[in-house]
Each structure stands twice: as C-alpha cells, then as structure tokens.
C-alpha cells in the first residue's frame, strides 16, 4: 500500500502542477508534516512486514505504533479542539497531545482488527477516504484531499482482487497487518487533521469532529465491543480471538 500511495500522491501532485501552474502551491503540505508523516508510515510499514513474515509480540507492535503516533503529533497534527463535544472546546497540549497519540494507536488497531473477511476493512476505508477527500476539498486543504483520494484509488483495485479474485489462479490478494495498519494510520491522520482548528482559520462545517470520526464508527465500535467481551471472560484484551462482529 505504501509504495502505491506514494506513487499516487506524487503523480497527482505532478499533474496538478502542470494543469494548474498558478495554483500549484495549494497542493503543498507543510514540510514538517510531510517528513514526519512519511517516517511514521515507513516505520509502520516495516513493522507490518515483520509481523506478517515472522510474527511480533503485541507489546512490540504497540511500542512501534506509539512511536509512529508520536511522530504524527510531533509534526503538529494533534486534536486541539473538541468543537463543543462534551462541553469542551479548545484543548491544552497537555491533554490533546497524549490523547491524540492514543487515538492514532486506537484507529490503527481498529482497522487492523476489523480486517477479518474479504472486503470489509478495504470497503469501509474506501468510503472513509472518499468522504475525507470531499471534506478536505470543501475546506480547501488540497494536499490532504490528494492524500485521501490517493488512498481511495489504491484501495479500489485491491478491493476488487480481494473480494472477486480467484485464489486458485493466484489472482487474490490480502491486506495483512502491513496494509491494514498503514491504512489505519492514514485514516487517523485525516480524521485528526480535519478536526483541528488553526489559529487563523475556522472549520466551515459545524460539529466537524463528529463528522470526521463518524466514518470510523464501525471499526471503533468493534474494538470496544471485543475488548469488553474479552475482559468479561477474563482473557487478555490484546490477544487475538474470534469474537469480532464479522
């Protein structure tokens, strides 16, 4: 997924600069966010490869996921406003930064855990990516809109071969931990960035935080339900089982 997404983003950026040379700057993402985000994505990508090939203990995976989340918030992408949700508005960095780290790790694992049947994780992610792309276009954040649509464009052919591919003819592909975790990371970044409030800008959509995270409601609900299910049965909440909604 990561190489395909990087190629898609680069291709779209190149085409946009040729078609709209005067407005090419609107597609630029801040350098710090791009650099830290790319490092986070590559780190999670290699962690996923190692997990798919040899298997990693969940503690090791959590440490790497937390490092990836720290890179994201260090780039300046963290949830700084609840927009009136729970009676809260602007958030202090002392709360917003650690909360954002936990949120990124939560969404990464939510997408990873719901990847249990063909087309489920990729189908939900396609809908979410399309929604984020439209919302970022409406808000005028073209760089993040490009990222969302690139993710969607990468997932659409995968969805076809994952659902309709023939395994006997070697035409069926699977997401694995590598793909699902990277998709979860990108979706978490898109959701948090869409919900952020910048000093000189205000969201055009009222209750933007609810709108942003509503796309991730199904995988989030599954994670919470599964953890409660395991806890009630005195099982390790981080150990895999067959108690998911799928």
Model regions: which residues?
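Alpha-helical transmembrane segments
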Residues: 5-23, 27-46, 120-246
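Membrane-water interface regions at transmembrane-helix termini and the short interhelical loops
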Residues: 46-54, 107-114
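A short, structure-level motif marking secondary-structure boundaries and short turns
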Residues: 53, 92-93, 230-234
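Membrane-helix boundary/helix-loop-helix interface segments in multi-pass membrane proteins
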Residues: 1-2, 16, 22-29, 48, ...
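Short, highly charged low-complexity linear segments
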Residues: 75-81, 102-110, 163-169, 192, ...
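Hydrophobic, well-ordered secondary-structure scaffolds
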Residues: 90-120, 124-133
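Glycine-rich, flexible loop/turn motifs
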Residues: 78, 84-87, 116, 169-171, ...
